[in-house]
Every structure is written in structure tokens, then in C-alpha cells.
């Protein structure tokens, strides 16, 4: 009997020891060669102590959560990484509902997916100066409500999508020493996901002088404001790098160190008012500067550029573009609907104009095509808006090129245009070419879409009705009335809001116009004279200067 009681007592003690051991193992344990974890359920605090690197916690599809603290995931509110820990393991704290993360002062590496989708963080997140590497997807989808992100001075590597879809305020400063922003490092998809968990970074963006490469989608769709200063030394800006960052303002000035600007790089950056391109470019990529609706100054495309890509400046609103002498090809839709362009000079050496390249533009001067042109695409100038009526057309300096869009079949030009050619150039035979009317020209006189009509009726100073016609040279500002008018003939000029001449003609009725100015024997008239500005550029009417 005594022996039996002894056995029962031993079994009870063993069971008690096992229970105590199991309880202790459940709230603490090892998580690295010399790293340990403990969870305090009363405060919801998970603490990583010890030293060195943590183990990686790599999830396998269908397997249980490999993290030793997996039983407490929903209870963890605070994560504290001890000062002697050097590496945070892969996926260690992903998808926690914690509100606070404190990273120890000797951590050097934050592993892949370490804090991915921690959407309940509040306050400020500080990455200490000891951290040199933030691996890919480390903070992907994490939200810092009403808080800021501070990146430590020792940081050198920011991995692919490290902070994608993060949300925090107060701006972002990338520390000196970082040479590359990896693909999608700070990208936001909130615009397309519709999820508030997919946040944006707000405030200013400061880039380091050490930066060399800005990866694809690096800052795409973010909510930055202020000016964007790209440091001298950056050589590559990846595709979509700043796409739809419409909060930036001022002039976007790309340093001459930049050799490559990827497709869609600054697509729909509507806040920029100016654009300076680097001297080292050889191609303007597809949609790289499209939909920059805020542009207000001329864009000069640098010498050395041979090709302007598809939609490169589509729907951007710069008032003028300067094309380089090295340009060979303008791809489809490159300048489609750039409504503020009033004129463009196509350089000698240009060979190809793609489909819809200038579709919907509103030039006020005639199009002159250099002798080098070999091909003009479908609807290249279709939808071209002009002011007034008359013999409108394109003026060719060389042989007849391939015109892909024939009349009434994806027209390359508006159907009422005439194609003017220089006598002696090849390919221009008969009365039509590609279905369009053709006619010779002298190489100088052009219809420039400034006149409301080519002839008109008016009144001389004695009340006699007269008829006249005219020609215009907009390069010199001289208008020539081709008929010998009586002394004192009345001439009317109309203006746009900026004081540019939009039409010139002879008066139909005396009472409909108000005298604005009188020079010698010619009178200058203007409709709605009370709101009319003065001319920006003087014009000459039959050698009488009008200002």
C-alpha cells in the first residue's frame, strides 16, 4: 500500500512539473541562436531579447504558422526588439495588430516581410541609425496612423516594395548614403485598390546626394507635395517612378547626369509648371511626360535625342516645344491633344511621324515638313484645330513621302487641306496625292491660319465700298494687301486675350467697329476695343507700322 501511494505521489509531481513547464514554454522561448522571446499577456508586449540574429519564420502554404508566439498573435499590441539583437528575421511580425514597434539600437538588418501588413501602427516609427538594410516587403502595407517615419543615417539599402502601400505623414527623407531606391519601394496602390489600408505618404520628399538609381514605381501614386529635387548624380529614373504624383509643384529639373527616364516615369504629374530635360537623353520614352497638364513654359528637347516615344507628351499643356536637330522619329500619339501648342518647327533630318502624333493639336501656323520626311502615319495631323478658313494645308520641302492615312481612310491630314510641294521634287504628279489636293508653292508664302478670310469688303474714307485680298508673313509680322487701296482705307485687326493677332480684314460696316489707333493713311480697328490689350508684336500693313 505504501509503495502504491509513493507511485501516485510521484506521478502527481511529474504531472505538475510538466504543466508548469508547458506554461513557461508557451509564453517564452528561443527565436535565434542567442535570441529569446517572451510575451506579457497583461500588457500585450512581445519582447525579443538576447543577442545576434533572429531566426527566419518562413511560411509554407498549408503549414501551421511557424512563429513561436503564434498562439498570441491577436493579443500582441507592442513589439520591442532588444538593443543587442542584430537582425530581425523574415516574416517575424507580419500581419500583427500591434500599435507600437520599438527597434533596438544595434539592429542592422530588417528581414523580408518582417512587419508586412501591420495596419494598426500609431505614433512615430523610428528606424535606428544602426540599420543598414531594409529587405524587400519589410513594411509592405503597414499603416502608421497620425505618425511619421524616420529612416536612420546608417541606411544603405531599401529593398523592393519595402514600404509599398504604407501610410504616414510628415514627409519622407531618404538618408545620405543610399544609392538606390528599389522597385516599388514607396509605391502606393490606394488609388486603384480603394482600400484605406493601402495608404499614401504625404508631405515633402527629400532625396540624398548619393542617389544613383530610382527604380520602377519607386514613388508612384504617392501624395507628396512641394518641389521635387532630383540630385545631380542620378543616372536612371525607372518606369512609373513618379507616376501620378500630382502634388509636386514648380519646375521639374532633371540633372544632366540622368541618361534614362523610363516609360510613364512622370505620367500625370499635373502639378509641375516647368520641365527641364537632361542633356544626356537619347530617347523620350513612352508616356514618360504625358498628361502634365500644369506645364506653362517651353519644353526644349535636348540635342542627341533621336526618338520621341509613343504618347510621350500626350495631353501635356506646354505652350511650345523645341525639337532637336538629331530627331529622326516621332512615334504615335507623341503630342496628341497638346492643346496649348501654337506652333512647332519640324527639324531637318526627321524621317517618321507616327499615327496620331499631332492629332487634336491647335497650331496657329502652317505645318512645314522637311525634305527628310519619309512616312506620315494615320491621323498624324487629324483633328488639327485652326482658326479661320481658306486654303489650309501642309507644306513639303522634299519628295512625296508615304502617307499612311489617305483621304477619308484614317486621314493623315484634315480632309479640306491641300498638300503644297516645291516644283521639281519627286513623287508629286497630277492633281491629287493620297487622295488630297496638291499644288505647287514657292517655298516662302504660307497660309498660317491667322486670317478669317482671304478677301473682304470694306469702306474707304469717302464711304465707297471696296474689295481687297491679302497675304501674311507671320515670321516678320508683315501683312500685304494685294490690291491698291484708296488712301484712308479702313483695316480691322482682332486679337486674342494675350494680344496676339488672330485675324485681319477690311471692314464690312463702319458702325460695327471702334477706332483703336490711327497711323498715316491706315486705320487700325478692333472688335470689343474696351477690353482689348495692345499688340505684343508689331505688324506692318502695306509698310505702315501698326503698334
Residue ranges and their predicted role:
Residues 26-30, 449-474:
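Transition segment at domain starts
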Residues 1-9:
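Bacterial N-terminal signal peptides that target proteins for export
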Residues 10-19:
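Bacterial N-terminal signal peptides
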Residues 45-51, 73-87, 97-109, 119-133, ...:
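Structural signature of tandem-repeat unit edges
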Residues 89-92, 111-116, 135-138, 159-162, ...:
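Consensus positions within tandem repeat domains that build extended binding/scaffold surfaces
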Residues 19-27:
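Sec-dependent signal peptide cleavage junction
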Residues 288, 377-448:
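Leucine-rich solenoid repeat scaffolds
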Residues 528-537:
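Short acidic/polar inter-strand loop motif in beta-rich domains
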